[in-house]
Curated annotation (Swiss-Prot):
Key words, A-Z: Hydrolase
Name this protein carries in UniProt: GTP cyclohydrolase FolE2
Site positions per UniProt: May be catalytically important: 155
Organism the protein comes from: Xylella fastidiosa (strain M12)
Metabolic or biological pathway, per its Swiss-Prot or TrEMBL entry: Cofactor biosynthesis; 7,8-dihydroneopterin triphosphate biosynthesis; 7,8-dihydroneopterin triphosphate from GTP: step 1/1
Gene from which this protein is expressed: folE2
């Protein structure tokens, strides 16, 4: 009985000799350590790890090598500085495949405790989907950090139509009245103010920004704060009625088409980030389809 274990990837030749741009694994379960200014955080994520395979005569890469490198790196905080070492090690581990490029993607939810809009003693958890890509090629590393921010959008056209209907209803009911006290008008509005209401919906902004190789942290809080400040209507966690009322006021003061939200983000992000991409989606309540828009400054 033979004691040697066959290694097909090493000893066999491919049926078709051709280089491959990327080869690796996807959906790898990994722990993710985040370095955040207000304290570290450990979350569960998934990763994709790949290298190029330019050697046409090599049947397959050594995926276990990539897995072990990723596993070893998982004990460290996820930072651009540390990731550079991981990518270099991935390429070096496949010198026998003539590999020159590597990339890793991480997917996870960043958890953040957020205060209520008005209630000082109330807060709750928000989860932000995050995607981080790092790619090494030709001696250069590129980093893209992507986060998805949820917010509320109220249609400007629908709001105008609702206001018109409310005004028409008021005039029709008081056509023969020459003067009304403020209290009477206020009472009428309390009873009839929702005669027609504009449609609004939960909306999503996916924001990608470029990071530098020298960055010692991802900068998630700064990016999320920037986006939510620009949009002004981020979805809430725990609320009381007073917070819900404040949220309604914010929505009324920030009527947005999908184009408006995208342009807001484009203008606001350009002040803080040299390269970014924005993808916005309004999950329409009027239509069975979504409204979408995107822009980039690279």
């Amino acid at each position: 009985m033979s004691t040697s274990i066959p290694d097909v990837a090493v000893h066999d030749s491919p049926a078709i000799a051709a280089p491959l741009r990327w080869v690796g694994m996807d959906g790898i379960v990994v722990p993710v350590q985040l370095t955040i200014a207000d304290g570290g955080q450990h979350v569960i994520g998934r990763a994709r790890a790949q290298i190029d395979l330019p050697a046409m005569e090599v049947k397959g890469i050594h995926m276990s090598r990539l897995y072990r490198l990723l596993d070893t790196h998982a004990v460290e905080p996820l930072t651009p500085v540390g990731i550079c070492g991981l990518l270099s090690a991935m390429v070096n581990s496949h010198a026998d495949c003539a590999s020159t490029a590597a990339r890793v993607d991480w997917y996870f939810d960043w958890l953040r405790r957020v205060p209520a809009l008005v209630s000082n003693d109330l807060s709750g958890w928000r989860g932000y989907p995050v995607w981080l890509r790092a790619e090494y090629s030709a001696g250069h590393v590129q980093f893209w950090l992507c986060v998805e921010v949820g917010y509320s959008s109220t249609c400007p056209c629908s709001a105008a139509l609702a206001r018109q209907m409310l005004a028409d209803a008021f005039l029709q009911e008081h056509v023969e009245v020459s003067a009304l006290s403020p209290e009477t008008v206020a009472d009428w509005l309390r009873s009839n103010g929702s005669y027609a209401t504009p449609h609004s919906q939960r909306s999503l902004a996916r924001i990608e920004v470029a990071l530098t190789e020298q960055a010692v942290e991802l900068g998630l809080p700064a990016l999320v704060d920037c986006a939510e400040r620009i949009l002004s209507t981020p979805v809430q966690a725990a609320v009381r009625r007073v917070d819900e009322q404040a949220f309604a006021r914010l929505n009324g003061a920030n009527l947005m088409y999908v184009e408006d939200a995208t342009r807001r983000l484009q203008h606001g992000l350009a002040i803080h980030y040299s390269a970014f991409r924005v993808h916005v989606r309004h999950l329409e309540s009027l239509h069975p389809h979504d409204a979408v828009a995107s822009t980039a400054d690279e």
